[in-house]
């Protein structure tokens, strides 16, 4: 049978990132109050727009630079920083994530391929034990669909399966990899109702990441085999 490599996203694919953000907001409201909390999220969105990626460390840095000490003393700022540094990400993994990764490991190579700021995403993946679950096979890029060649070079396989919640990433990756890639759309999180562009239809759609356990190797390979 051809060798398989599974390229797994993190945010809203393996981990309920929308819920994480709600938790952050609740903690920030306690530490900062409503005005500075809104200020932080405004900075967060500004950074996301400028960098085309979420960057928590840069957002925190700008918060410190833009808010004077009388409004945000250093101790409070350090408490805010610790909210992000010490968050128990493992508690926000979707049900049966580890079982799903263990199942996929019986079919091929499992690789976490995430995008975002390199520091915060790395902490998230390690602290949630996802890195351990895939044997340390973790790649983080600012925009992973722009690094397909690097992904394939690091983890060569006859066929690839990308499991992701973001329609545009799946479309872009298929455009690059063609029939060497099976795309699996996981309908979780804020992109779950987003339509695919140009009538694109994912090869496989599942409502929950745990449903991936019901897919056989033959089904993952069906696109390559022209079925």
Q: Locations of the language-model features?
A:
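Asp-based, Mg2+/Mn2+-dependent phosphohydrolase catalytic module
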Residues: 1-2, 126, 130-162, 166-227
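Active-site neighborhood of HAD-like aspartate-dependent phosphohydrolases
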Residues: 1-43
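Short, acidic loop-to-helix structural element flanking the phosphoryl-transfer center
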Residues: 82-112, 145
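Conserved Rossmann-like nucleotide-cofactor binding loop
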Residues: 13, 118-119, 168, 191
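A metal-dependent, Asp-based hydrolase signature
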Residues: 20, 34, 45-85
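Short, surface-exposed alpha-helical segments at coil->helix boundaries
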Residues: 22, 26, 57, 118-122
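Substrate-recognition/cap helix-loop segment adjacent to the acidic, metal-dependent catalytic center
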Residues: 98-111, 115-139
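Short hydrophobic segments within beta-strands
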Residues: 9-10, 15, 113, 163, ...
């Amino acid at each position: 049978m051809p060798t398989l490599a599974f390229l797994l996203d993190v945010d809203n694919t393996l981990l309920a990132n929308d819920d994480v953000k709600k938790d952050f907001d609740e903690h920030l409201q306690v530490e900062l109050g409503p005005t500075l909390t809104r200020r932080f999220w405004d900075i967060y969105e500004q950074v996301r727009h400028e960098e085309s990626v979420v960057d928590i460390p840069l957002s925190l840095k700008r918060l410190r630079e833009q808010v004077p000490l009388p409004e945000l003393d250093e101790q409070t700022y350090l408490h805010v920083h610790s909210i992000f540094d010490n968050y128990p990400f493992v508690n926000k993994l979707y049900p049966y994530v580890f079982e799903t990764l263990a199942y996929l490991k019986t079919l091929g190579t499992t690789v976490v391929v995430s995008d975002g700021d390199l520091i915060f995403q790395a902490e998230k993946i390690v602290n949630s034990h996802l890195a351990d679950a895939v044997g340390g096979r973790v790649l983080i890029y600012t925009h992973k669909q722009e690094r397909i060649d690097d992904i394939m070079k690091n983890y060569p396989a006859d066929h690839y399966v990308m499991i992701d919640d973001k329609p545009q990433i799946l479309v872009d990756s298929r455009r690059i990899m063609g029939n060497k890639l099976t795309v699996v759309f996981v309908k979780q999180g804020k992109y779950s109702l987003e339509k695919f562009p140009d009538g694109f239809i994912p090869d496989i759609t599942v409502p929950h990441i745990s449903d991936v356990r019901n897919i056989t190797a033959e089904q993952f390979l069906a696109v390559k085999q022209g079925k």
